[in-house]
């Protein structure tokens, strides 16, 4: 009998799984043994600053350890951390901590099996092809950036073909690039090839030119052959964990690969999906991009992580955590607050429970997960397990395909950030940017309004001024960038950076 082991190979300290092959096998053999796991979304409060985590990965690891301790077959699907960001010291790694850690964290945090490097090489090869197309007269401009996982301000803008027109290029971080998004959203190598062919390389006489018009796509898919396979590792307590895909949540889509989540659902009863940064970032994109536009599974429950200090130490920002919890509850997702304690905060448990009760939350889950791991959670999960086992069927959200870009932006502002449409403002140049994007899409034979909306924003703020009174908060729309191959359109809001390593990423 064919099993997942037939699609698995040892790759150093971890295993690599041919998820495309396994899911194709299941599709062709509907009677083959499989599970139909439920998805739990782990997200967080908006951090006080971008370099400060709330503990989502530590929580995710502790949670699957606790569920397995209770006899529930649970796993987690995590994004691969960016080695560049970790090395530069902007934030910790993405392997948990203390008793809620992955085995071999140094491997996970420092490149895993070369997946990020392969995506970097493949996108840079595409740009090299575009540069050659400039010389061959097939392009006048290049729109796809080079990428690097190591941040560098000096690479913010460059020029190639000096003396032949000084064609401008730019360099962005690998986790923000379009090819990363394509890997995350694709369910087969054929789909990756098709999406790469639709990437807009640049323009000729003002018209879009795609890579499919002049690139042998097998060269790109060949580089990605191992990168498209999820890695399987485990927690220090033996719970299985899959790691695959690494897009940032504030300037990209912030979710693991769809195929890794679907594979995990076929193998386990509960699948914890960790989405990057706060509920206004990765969780919004899981719900509104992965689920709404790409058919990913709607969560059967959610956990919103915060730290006691994030939630309560800054009264002007205290509105954000209840907003996140209530937003998910309003979507009929049973949502559980989780307070990740730090050393010296155990005495705050009674007051934290009282505050949660005043706000009408479900009973909060509270623990020092670094110190105690899953043991701190297991006794507190009765309500959570009951919601998973007895909850209603997950929703099937309607697509926003065809919705005007500006209307989509206003919808996200109102539903994800709490800012009504009348307080969404257009910065100078935004309308022109939309018109240019619309013309570019039309020349490529697609509609701008059919692309899924991606907010590009600061991870540490939801609006232009989160400290302002509610009736004064605004969201500013700045510029638009088309990622046609990935089927996405980026809209810049608030402050965001995609290349350098500032104090706030």
UniProtKB/Swiss-Prot annotation:
GO terms for molecular function: ATP binding; formate-tetrahydrofolate ligase activity. It is an enzyme of class 6 (ligase). GO terms for biological process: tetrahydrofolate interconversion. Keywords: ATP-binding, Ligase, Nucleotide-binding, One-carbon metabolism. It catalyses: (6S)-5,6,7,8-tetrahydrofolate + formate + ATP = (6R)-10-formyltetrahydrofolate + ADP + phosphate. Its EC number is 6.3.4.3. Belongs to the formate--tetrahydrofolate ligase family. This is Formate--tetrahydrofolate ligase. It comes from Bifidobacterium longum (strain NCC 2705).
């Amino acid at each position: 009998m064919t099993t997942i082991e037939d699609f698995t190979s040892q790759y150093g300290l971890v295993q690599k799984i041919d998820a495309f092959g396994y899911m194709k096998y299941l599709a062709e053999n509907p009677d083959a043994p499989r599970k139909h796991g439920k998805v739990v979304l782990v997200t967080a409060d908006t951090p006080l600053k971008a370099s400060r985590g709330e503990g989502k990965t530590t929580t995710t690891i502790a949670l699957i350890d606790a569920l397995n301790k209770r006899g529930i077959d649970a796993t987690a699907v995590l994004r691969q951390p960016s080695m560049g960001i970790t090395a530069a010291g902007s934030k910790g790694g993405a392997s948990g901590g203390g008793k809620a850690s992955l085995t071999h964290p140094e491997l996970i945090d420092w490149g895993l099996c070369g997946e990020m490097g392969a995506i970097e090489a493949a996108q840079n090869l595409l740009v090299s092809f575009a540069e050659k197309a400039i010389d061959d007269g097939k392009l006048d401009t290049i729109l796809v950036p080079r990428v690097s996982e190591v941040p560098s301000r000096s690479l913010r803008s460059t020029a190639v073909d000096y003396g032949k027109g000084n064609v401008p290029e730019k360099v962005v971080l690998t986790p923000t690039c379009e090819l990363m998004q394509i890997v995350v959203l694709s369910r087969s190598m054929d789909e990756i090839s098709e999406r790469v062919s639709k990437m807009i390389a640049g323009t000729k006489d003002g018209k879009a030119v795609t890579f499919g018009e002049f690139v042998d796509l097998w060269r790109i898919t060949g580089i990605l052959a191992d990168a498209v396979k999820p890695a399987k590792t485990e927690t220090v307590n033996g719970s299985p964990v899959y790691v695959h895909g690494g897009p940032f949540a504030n300037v990209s889509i912030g979710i693991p690969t769809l195929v890794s989540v679907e594979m995990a659902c076929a193998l386990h009863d509960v699948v914890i999906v960790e989405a990057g940064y706060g509920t206004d970032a990765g969780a919004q994109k899981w719900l509104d991009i992965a689920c709404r536009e790409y058919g990913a599974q709607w969560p059967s429950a959610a956990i919103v992580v915060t730290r006691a200090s994030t939630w309560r130490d800054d009264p002007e920002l205290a509105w954000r955590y209840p907003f996140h919890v209530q937003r998910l509850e309003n979507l009929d997702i049973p949502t559980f607050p989780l307070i990740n304690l730090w050393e010296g905060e155990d005495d705050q448990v009674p007051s934290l429970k009282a505050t949660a009760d005043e706000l009408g939350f479900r009973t909060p889950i509270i623990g020092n997960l670094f110190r105690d791991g899953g043991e701190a959670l297991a006794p507190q999960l009765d309500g959570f397990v009951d919601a998973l086992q007895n909850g209603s069927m997950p929703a099937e959200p309607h697509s926003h395909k065809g919705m005007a870009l500006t209307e989509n932006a206003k919808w996200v502002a109102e539903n994800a950030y709490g800012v009504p449409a009348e307080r969404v403002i257009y910065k100078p140049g935004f309308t022109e940017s939309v018109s240019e994007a619309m013309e570019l899409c039309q020349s490529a034979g697609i509609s701008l309004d059919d692309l899924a909306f991606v907010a590009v924003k600061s991870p540490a703020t939801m609006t232009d001024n989160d400290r302002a009174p509610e009736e004064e908060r605004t969201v500013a729309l700045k510029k638009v960038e088309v990622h046609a191959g990935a089927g996405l359109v980026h809209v810049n809001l608030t402050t965001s950076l995609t290349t350098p390593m500032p104090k706030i990423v």
